[in-house]
């Protein structure tokens, strides 16, 4: 059942020059800026008694604003007692270190058992925030840092920061192949034309930019540090596969085991058992959505990646004399 929303207020003189959607988001902090933008586009907003359907229209201050809208009841998700590794928390945000095998948001094939269900149990008031405060995601088997908003104002500002590319996200990964230098992949990404659960580089896709640098060389693998400018689904995995260096263990984009010649049984066994993409969100830096203070968190790589890197490093040391690129 839809919930009726009727709001009235006067634009402050201090908001002179702001976009209408920005001004309304400040005036009505219980509603996200994206929701307010939808109401404007749907002609649910009156400014001085006249319909306004332009979110970018500038306000002068002193306007009388009335909103007459409806909110469709969102799907109700169950709180579930799923452990969360909380790296940081205050009144406005939570930063978690997500493990593997944990989906962020319920969807087809994963109706529950997600980060969202865990958040609803850990902090019940987050149910009043759209998507339980989730503003960005990690793939099911990608580990590492995520920030979650505990309030609507915090969520609105975090989303805006993401859109302005003010949030820095860095990852560690292990890629297949010997890479000679770091670089940037600037290639648009969209849904795969035939495999609907896959993504692909496509000229008609959304802009996507990934920067990478080399941390360590192994015989036929490379340890990387990567930084996202954009946050497309599967972005790092798609971009690395596109440049013919898919991530180790990636079941979707070509990361099948490729042990080097003469590898030890320990190396081969570890590589074959590594059944997820070797990708970890290791650093998150942002400006706090309410205080504006710059904050930064780090999460060390998980044990499965530690073991993978150790056997690759041992193999490299054992066969260093056979490597032709040193």
Curated annotation (Swiss-Prot):
Pfam family, one: S4
Subcellular location: Cytoplasm
Domain of life from the UniProt record: Bacteria
EC number(s) recorded for this UniProt protein: 5.4.99.23
GO annotation (BP), single: enzyme-directed rRNA pseudouridine synthesis
Limits of the S4 RNA-binding domain: 18-91
GO cellular component: cytoplasm
Keyword Isomerase listed: yes
Keywords: Cytoplasm, Isomerase, RNA-binding, rRNA processing
Catalysis: reaction(s): uridine(1911/1915/1917) in 23S rRNA = pseudouridine(1911/1915/1917) in 23S rRNA
CDD domains: PseudoU_synth_RluA_like, S4
Principal place of residence: cytoplasm
Active site: residue positions: 139
Family statement drawn from the similarity comment of this UniProt entry: Belongs to the pseudouridine synthase RluA family.
Protein name: Ribosomal large subunit pseudouridine synthase D
Protein species of origin: Escherichia coli O157:H7
């Amino acid at each position: 059942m839809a919930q009726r929303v009727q709001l009235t207020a006067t634009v402050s003189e201090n908001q002179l020059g702001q976009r209408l959607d920005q001004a309304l988001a400040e005036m009505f902090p219980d509603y996200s800026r994206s929701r307010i933008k939808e109401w404007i586009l749907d002609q649910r907003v009156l400014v001085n008694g006249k319909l306004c359907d332009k979110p970018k229209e500038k306000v002068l201050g002193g306007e009388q604003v009335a909103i007459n809208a409806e909110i469709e009841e969102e799907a109700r998700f169950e709180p579930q007692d799923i452990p969360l590794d909380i790296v940081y928390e205050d009144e406005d945000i939570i930063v978690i270190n997500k493990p593997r095998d944990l989906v962020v948001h319920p969807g087809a094939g994963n109706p529950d058992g997600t980060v969202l269900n865990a958040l609803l149990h850990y902090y019940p008031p987050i149910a009043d925030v759209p998507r339980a405060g989730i503003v960005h995601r990690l793939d099911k088997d990608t580990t590492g840092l995520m920030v979650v908003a505990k309030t609507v104002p915090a969520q609105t500002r975090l989303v805006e920061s993401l859109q302005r590319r003010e949030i820095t996200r860095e990852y560690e990964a292990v890629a297949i192949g010997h890479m000679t230098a770091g670089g940037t992949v600037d290639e648009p990404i969209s849904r795969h034309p035939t495999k609907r659960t896959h993504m692909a580089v496509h000229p008609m896709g959304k802009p996507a930019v990934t920067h990478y640098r080399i941390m360590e060389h192994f015989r036929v693998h490379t340890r990387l540090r990567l930084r996202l400018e954009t946050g497309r689904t599967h972005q790092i995995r798609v971009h690395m596969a596109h440049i013919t260096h898919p991530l180790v263990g990636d079941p979707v984009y070509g990361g099948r085991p490729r042990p080097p010649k003469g590898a030890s049984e320990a190396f081969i066994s570890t590589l074959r058992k590594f059944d997820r993409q070797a990708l970890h969100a290791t650093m998150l830096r942002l400006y706090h959505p309410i205080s504006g203070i710059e904050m930064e968190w780090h999460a060390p790589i998980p044990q499965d990646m530690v073991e993978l890197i150790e056997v690759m490093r041992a193999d490299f040391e054992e066969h260093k004399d056979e490597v032709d690129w040193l």
